[in-house]
Amino acid sequence: MSLASQAALAELARPKGGPIAHTYSIVARDPVTGDMGVAVQSHAMSVGGIVSWGEAGVGVVATQAGVDPGYGGKGLDLMRKGVSAPQALKQLVARDPNPEGRQVAMLDARGRVSAYTGPKAIAAAGHYVGRDYSVQANIMVNEKVWTAMAAAFESAQGDLADRLLAALDGAQAAGGDIRGKMSAALLVVRAKSSGRPWWGGDRLFDVRVEEHADPLVELRRLLRLQRAGNYSNRGDELMTGKKVDEALAVYRKAMELAPEVLELQFWYAATLVVVDKEAEATPLFRDLFSKEPFWLEVLRRLPAAGLFPSDPAIMKRMATLAPTP
């Protein structure tokens, strides 16, 4: 058979409405906080851009296999209007002219959850719906993958993001995608909307690995960095509320969680000076300037922005901490 004939057959076999994204994923809700999340790993590139969908106070969706991304937006729209996740999924599958190759899971803010695996999803394919979660997979090495995901999720410790990652690890340990691995994504949204739909507001975590030899390792690294960013954002909120000691504690957590991100050390040290703790800031600035000297110039620009004391004596002392050229 010619390459052209093979391509034509492949196009005929492709479910209409979107690209192919064979994969494994999980949608879940934390019953304590109400936060909701979706996590995914696939051999397809940039899987997070089409598979994972979520909105604070509404729900989360994973749409995969012969993907119709419309299940994401339409599913959230129905749940936003009060339709339960199971009913929303049922309605969308019924309207789909080519549902046989789809695999979709939906979960709403009340924890109602449902999944669908079409009869033409490539084996091994299936799903398992548990309390406040669903795991689903297709084109896997074997039929143990989604049950391994469920077991890993149910036994995992930590917050929802940690448990979502554990489910992905469980899938990979059971064999994972028969083709290997390439990309991954994790999204966690709040139980209720704050009106700020971005990361740092309604999106507690939103990390994607577009292409990597070991996407789950990279996803975990990115999650750690974003977690540090969350601490830093919380520190800013506490400083605004004049809760200085609490703010300094979370700024320090951010710095310690991601020591390679020197900017976190910079802002922690700068804040220490602002609150008259220059002695504590001195070793931090000395270390920082020795690694990346440009931070001294950044510091010099802060007084004009109202973010550092406008005191020449303080700035002169800071300058002495930088290494001599």
Predicted regions and their residues:
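Register position in tetratricopeptide repeats
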Residues: 240, 274-275, 308
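Canonical tetratricopeptide repeat
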Residues: 233, 267, 301-302
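Alpha/propeptide regions of enzymes that mature by internal proteolysis
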Residues: 9-179, 210-243, 256
